Amino acid sequence: MPRTRAVVHTFHVAALGVWLGSLLMTGVAAAILFPTMKGLDPKLPAFAEYTGDHWMIAAGRAADRIFSINDALQLACALVVVVTLAAGAVWCNLRPTGLRGVLRLLALCVALVALGFQLFVLAPRMSLNLRTYWQAAQAGDRPLADRHQAAFSTDHTTAQNTLATITLAVGVLLLLSVWPQGLAAPTPPTTPPTPRPAGDSPLEPPALLKGLR
């Protein structure tokens, strides 16, 4: 059973680590990609009739792949986290208890609710607006492209806040999962007993002997 507990806990922590790492690296990639592409200011032959910013389309195409991979990783990691938490509670007596357990469950619920909102509400709507924007831009329909780009940008702020919430919740959950249960109270230093002189008795001498001394 101790080995099973260790395996379950290891998978739980590993899934949280991959989940958090995926979120952080996705944010870093986006923060690097868009300014770099803006500085390059490419002109895309496939969008020759579009008079808007081509760098935004080029960066968006690359970022869309990155965020799609991140979404898949998040979903897989969330499933592993939930399964290992349930398996640990049922078979390995790894039930979250006390304030620490309440905080872990709260962080997990926040992460799962935010992830569900991201995957099943925001992502489909943003994907539809993004692809319509690209199609309109490729056809040279600037008004339609601008309209869907604006709709995408409106959701983009919400998506950023949602991903930040997931990152914070997963980070807290990971910290609580690996933090030691508690620190033992320090043991006071023991002073070795003072040796008694030879011939000294630890017993109180009788009163009669005291009077004779």
Segments (PLM) and residue ranges:
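Hydrophobic alpha-helical transmembrane segments in integral membrane proteins
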Residues: F120-N129
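Interfacial loop at the N-terminal end of multi-pass membrane proteins
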Residues: P2-V13, G17-R95, L128-Q149
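Cytoplasmic juxtamembrane regions at transmembrane-helix boundaries
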Residues: V81-L106, S177-L203
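Short, charged juxtamembrane terminal tails flanking transmembrane helices
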Residues: T191, L208-R213
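Alpha-helical transmembrane segments and their helix-start/interface "positive-inside/aromatic belt" motifs
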Residues: R3-G21, G101-A111, V170-L176
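Individual transmembrane alpha-helices with interfacial aromatic-anchor signatures
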Residues: I66, D146-T167
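A hydrophobic membrane-anchoring alpha-helix module
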Residues: T165-V172, W179-L183
